[in-house]
């Protein structure tokens, strides 16, 4: 098992896991912890991944390759009050396999702060 720690600040989407560049296109996530560390405000969280899937329009014609990106939400506009943590555990079966993908988090406000801990099996 390995752990990924991230301190997220602001409302710009941040990449948490990137199989495009780390070369690991099959990871199983045991858990994801999200903690709102802002002193006074709640935060709305989007947690989602992009899956890159190559599409071939003609068999054996590699010139006609087109990559399509699919977006799948794990959380969408979930409000976390100040000082509260939420835990997404493996009972949700976060198994990201068989493809290139990026896992993202996006917060609702420019001064939002969230700590993320991802436990990879």
Regions found by a protein language model. Give the residues of each.
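C-terminal interaction-tip segments
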Residues: 1-27, 44, 49-57, 97-121
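Short solvent-exposed strand-capping/beta-turn motif centered on an Asx-Ser/Thr pair
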Residues: 34-40, 108-110
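A structural signal for the main folded, soluble domain(s) of proteins
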Residues: 20-23, 33, 80, 91-92
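Intrinsically disordered, low-complexity Pro/Gly/Ser/Thr-rich segments with frequent PxxP/GP/PP motifs
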Residues: 53-102
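Detector for Asparagine
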Residues: 7, 24, 36, 60-61, ...
């Amino acid at each position: 098992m390995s752990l990924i720690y991230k301190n997220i600040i602001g409302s710009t989407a941040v990449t948490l896991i990137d199989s495009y560049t780390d070369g690991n296109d099959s990871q199983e996530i045991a858990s994801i912890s999200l903690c709102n560390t802002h002193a006074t405000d709640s935060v709305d969280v989007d947690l989602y991944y992009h899956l890159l899937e190559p599409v071939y329009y003609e068999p054996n014609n590699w010139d006609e390759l087109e990559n399509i990106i699919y977006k799948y939400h794990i959380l969408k506009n979930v409000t976390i009050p100040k000082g509260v943590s939420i835990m997404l555990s493996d009972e949700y079966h976060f198994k990201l396999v068989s493809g290139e993908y990026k896992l993202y988090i996006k917060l609702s406000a420019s001064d939002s702060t969230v700590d993320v801990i991802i436990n990879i099996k």
